[in-house]
């Protein structure tokens, strides 16, 4: 018998046997089967009962109550319960129903009708009490099935397959659920033109992710609803097919094909009234294919060629090339419609069209300056994504951020709330104390607590009033949006009386109320501008600064308005860098000017912020200036992309910068330069010892220096427009340290060496070639302070103070001076004379936490260190006394 049952019918009977056995019932009754049918996920029984006029929940509750009342055997029984006489009769009736309906398998609806028709049984009585009879169930079957027949064991899965696996876009457009589509008229007209063809009427929308391919289809749905289409498309139904849900849960071989076939049959039987849309159309290639079975693409081909299926597809250029173009037989059935990225001006128009929807959703006001900022800033700073998607995301997130702030208590209220809690806890403790001091403190505390509570109460009242105003405006906008949708619906249906009632009665009333609420907000804003004390606790308007904050969060690029403090910092940038890098004013000025141009917004938007070649002998501060710049911009000198060019001496090492080509090891890993900049687009990039690299490296950098972009091994474009590129080199350093040459001769000799090593097209693209001069003996004194400060900083955890006398500083500067090697010999000298001696004293226990260490030079070959602990000096030099320390200090 089970051979004639569908899979779901077999599962229902199996579940009924299990539940009867678990409950200790001697027989399997119709109640058990009825309960199993109602509990089935994606089952037909509940839908059929609803269609027949019954309440599945009420019937299910009655069935469960009846099951509890069934007699159960005590003790455990190993025998399986048998079908009762009533259940046997119901199954026999179900088989008769199957034959009468012309089906090939007994399905769950046959079982349900069989139970209702084979009276007397308890399940039939429950159904009848709830207004469901065998006749009403039979009448409801065609509607639930969608006209399908039971011709396979998985038939229930194909009932109303189109409704189950698709979304009706025209219905969504009628209900106003789709966002308005601004522009894209040319693309929509082209789609309509292709759909109007007799054969091969299948447009496929191709474009980069985020340019608005799906929006074109939504725009078509809105035009169909509005009647703004040719007669060939008027009244048509546009549905979006979900291949993912069709594949999901298809456990058995052929189940996916069965579902797709059911959908295609429903579309075919609609006689051209249905237009199908498949987003990510490339997924049809290979979908459902396993062990030789056909994929969705091959099943669609015949209908696509004959024009029986009008299909709109959407996919990206890469996916179309990789999947659709590989199958010429499938590709020729589609007509391509290219959807390009809109311009910044078009994006602003799109954002203005969407503004009302986002204002109604977030219940905030979105200023026009925010829309312009979203389009322009996203176009300039967010690479790797397309307009208008990235601009819409910026506005959406900025509005969501503001809404979150509006729904949270302001910081002032939080602080006062915490203060009240703290004072209340202290009050409880003081009330228990009896001493006079505690009582006096209690009186003062209670006065402070009363004052704080009063302040908190006033702030809360003000906050509640502000929130009420914000919410009123938001609610009115949402209501206005709903009324417009209703008016459009009544107009389409021809119900002009209701439409005019909304258009000329309710909408003007809401608009008047909204205008009054908005003007009240505007007056409040003007008052707060005149008197900062009246400023709103949280603003309710998304402006350009709000959008700039989101851009900064996404990219790390500071694109917000320059604050007064930052203005001062940028104007005195040379002073800050000059504290770290001694004696190189020309280089510091060149870098500072580049940063100021960028932050003021007047640098060339298509080139890097700055590109410099630093020339000079070793140890004069070339690399240190790059570190200082990273520290100035990011408060962290490690926030710098450092490429040691000595590692790129071979020709093959070029691929390490931008990533290996396809087919080579390391292709998936990306390049060391491109990946670092892609993750941190606002950074200082240092190419250290650039003359040691293979000459072919510079051919790769030409595009970066000129256009601010570089394509990596995987074909992705990496944006370098917000980076500062610094290259350091020792070329010609022998001329710079030659004291017999004058300044002009030195410069000419160095530039000749540079021109011999680098190509003209590389040098011509640099913003500036900066020469670092050898350090003088006087400048080395400043570097002594920096090096000693570094040692002192490392001792702060142990609270050890380093006190260096003037004689020690002078000795370090004189001994460590070597114009050919710069500041590095001085660093080594400080390490050996101060660091090494201090380490020995620490290990010997001569220096303890909290001590002061005196560094002095009294004429010997080395510096002398003395530890000042309490009232005595612990020293390696017996000649140094407390008096000497006092005198030196």
UniProtKB/Swiss-Prot annotation:
Subcellular localization: Cytoplasm
Molecular function GO terms recorded: ATP binding; ATP hydrolysis activity
Keywords from the UniProt entry: ATP-binding, Chaperone, Coiled coil, Cytoplasm, Nucleotide-binding, Repeat, Stress response
Region annotation Repeat 1: where it falls in the sequence: 5-70
Protein name stated in the entry: Chaperone protein ClpB
Superkingdom of this protein's organism: Bacteria
The keyword Nucleotide-binding is assigned to this record: yes
Quaternary structure and interacting proteins, as annotated: Homohexamer. The oligomerization is ATP-dependent.
CDD domains linked to this entry: AAA (cd00009), RecA-like_ClpB_Hsp104-like (cd19499)
Family: Belongs to the ClpA/ClpB family.
Annotated source species: Bifidobacterium longum (strain NCC 2705)
Record's compositionally biased regions (Low complexity): 525-535
